[in-house]
UniProtKB/Swiss-Prot annotation:
This is Probable glucomannan 4-beta-mannosyltransferase 10. GO terms for molecular function: glucomannan 4-beta-mannosyltransferase activity. It is an enzyme of class 2 (transferase). One of its GO terms (biological process) is cell wall organization. It is a multi-pass membrane protein. Coiled coil: none annotated. The gene is CSLA10.
Length: 552
């Protein structure tokens, strides 16, 4: 009705001004005055019409849509919070009641028999996949060969996919050195790199001497186990025939390399403390971390061995074995030294694989999990909802969409109320639970939050690529170890090296940073909350990442 009346007034004023202009016989000043009235009437009507139309469209469509997005994010926030509290309660239960694996499962130290001697020890195969690992090959091979285990019951298998002839010779020299000391070490090579790591592991299992082994241990080239690793882990498999996997925790030797490695340490420590510990305690299932784990050969064979259909062959094998009813044991007290990516580009590629691969595996295995009849309905629910849907998909997307899109955009919608519990209290409690895993880094919590939000953009993109199976879904990342850092590059590497400055610039981070900065400025001048303080910090984090000033 208001629009209709304004239209009538506009027509009336326009007609009067036009008639006055056409038929008025006075001076030219009067004609100019009439023309001015006509122009004013038209401009006023245009502004009135535009304002009215915009407000109505905003109130009828934009605001309700934004409210729906906020409500959806609030629901997801509660689900993430409940999941986090549940995992931490399980960990607390383990600590308070001392429910360590040694008390839950049978464990007895391996001992020699007077008559049989070493025959009481099972045959163990140690696999070390590597690709042009010049800087760490001596460390990794040496650590594997120093494992305390009868030499006649241990086989060390170096799966060398190196393309550099010099590095191949170094591997041969190192293997020959340990062979001369009595270690049964084999160096196996392929004429192709099909399947990458999964392909190398699968090919390594085809050799005749592997059939003599009962268990297989996998160490990536930058992992250095302690000599007593097998003595702590293998007894769980020997005395518990229902156990298929024993996983050790990672310990990071270069965590103090830079601020980025410190924040990675916080995230991964929480992953092991909460996700792996709670999964092992409550469901006897968790994802194999791809290294520092001991597998039962029979379980691997029953599950179908290594598959290279995704970039997370370790998780693929774990899920298939879990669906067959096999149990997994996580040893929080058993640690293996490893390294963290210290370059931002390397870390981005790694996070892409770690987010894209699980999402793609979920797409491929969802129906297989639902139709499975060998595990309980609760374990299937845990796999579908908690393990995959919530932790591997929803968390990544929610973090970016809510904290980097919805919250910044909310400054333009003062009529939409976002409760404080969703923006402050719940995130604070979740963050506190995460920081507990790394107490020494408590003072870095603000930097960790901002950095995790930046990385959530890459994880969200990787998740969608995995779910939709787009072009980069099977992109494999080779991690070249440098002794104290990791250097990552794509395979194959095509073309000439580009400008170093351009390689440091990340346009996506810069664009998101500029948008959040604009929202922060708007909130500062026109908002009535302190949200702009967070937005300014988050914008700076995106912009710093955008120009490559992260990592070494």
């Amino acid at each position: 009705m208001t629009t209709f009346l304004k239209s009538l007034i506009f027509l009336q004023d326009s007609c009067l001004a036009f008639l006055s202009l056409m038929f008025h016989r006075g001076s030219s000043e009067d004609a100019a005055e009439a023309l001015k009235k006509l122009e004013t009437s038209i401009n006023g009507a245009r502004i009135s019409f535009d304002t009215t139309w915009t407000r109505e469209f905003r109130s009828l469509f934009i605001v309700p849509l934004f409210k729906c997005l906020v409500a959806f994010c609030l629901i997801i926030s509660l689900l993430v919070f409940i999941e986090g509290i549940y995992m931490n309660l399980v960990v607390l239960y383990v600590k308070v009641f001392e429910r360590k694996p040694e008390k839950v499962y049978r464990w007895e130290a391996m001992q020699e028999d007077i008559e049989l001697g070493h025959e009481t020890y099972p045959m163990v195969l140690v696999q070390i996949p590597m690709y042009n690992e010049k800087e760490v090959l001596q460390l990794s091979i040496g650590a594997a060969c120093r494992l305390i285990w009868p030499l006649d019951r241990l086989i060390v298998q170096v799966l060398d996919d190196s393309t550099d002839q010099t590095i191949k010779e170094l591997v041969n020299t190192e293997c020959a050195k340990w062979e001369s000391k009595g270690v049964n070490i084999k160096c196996e090579r392929r004429d192709n790199r099909n399947g990458y790591k999964a392909g190398a592991l699968k090919e390594g299992m085809k050799h005749n001497y592997v059939k003599l082994c009962n268990y297989v241990v996998i160490f990536d080239a930058d992992f250095q186990p302690e000599p007593d690793y097998l003595q702590h882990s293998v007894p769980f498999l020997v005395h518990n025939p229902e156990v298929a996997l024993v996983q050790a925790r990672w310990r990071f030797m270069n965590a103090n390399k830079c601020l980025m490695t410190r924040m990675q340490e916080m995230s991964l420590n929480y992953h092991f403390m909460a996700e792996q510990e709670s999964g092992s305690t409550r469901h006897a299932f968790f994802s194999f971390n791809g290294t520092a784990g001991v597998w039962r050969m029979a379980a691997m064979e029953e599950a179908g061995g290594w598959h290279d259909r995704t970039t997370v062959e370790d998780m693929d094998l774990a899920v298939r074995a879990g669906l067959l009813g096999w149990k997994f044991v996580f040893l929080n007290d058993l640690t293996v030294k490893s390294e963290l990516p210290s370059k931002f580009k390397a870390f981005r590629f790694q996070q892409h694989r770690w987010s894209c691969g699980p999402a793609n595996l979920f797409r491929k295995m969802i129906m297989e999990i639902i139709r499975n009849k060998r595990v309980t309905i609760w374990k299937k629910l845990y796999l579908v909802y908690s393990f995959f849907f919530l932790r591997k998909i929803i968390v990544h997307c929610f973090t970016f969409i809510f904290y980097c899109v919805i919250l910044p955009t909310s400054v333009f919608f003062p009529e939409v109320n976002i409760p404080a519990w969703s923006t402050f209290y719940i995130p604070s409690m979740i963050t506190l639970c995460i920081v507990i895993a790394t107490p020494r880094s408590f003072y870095l919590v603000i930097f960790w939050i901002l950095f995790e939000n930046v990385m959530s953009m890459h994880r969200t993109k990787g998740t969608f690529i995995g779910i939709l199976e787009r072009q980069r879904v099977n992109e494999w990342v080779v991690t070249e170890k440098l002794g104290d850092a990791l250097k990552t590059k794509l395979l194959p590497r095509i073309g000439k090296p580009s400008n170093m400055f351009l390689e440091r610039v990340n346009s996506k981070e810069i664009m998101v940073g500029i948008y959040i900065l604009c929202c922060a400025c708007y909130g500062l001048f026109f908002g009535n909350t302190l949200l702009y303080l967070y937005l300014f910090m988050q914008a700076v984090a995106f912009l710093i990442s955008g120009v490559g000033f992260v990592g070494t």
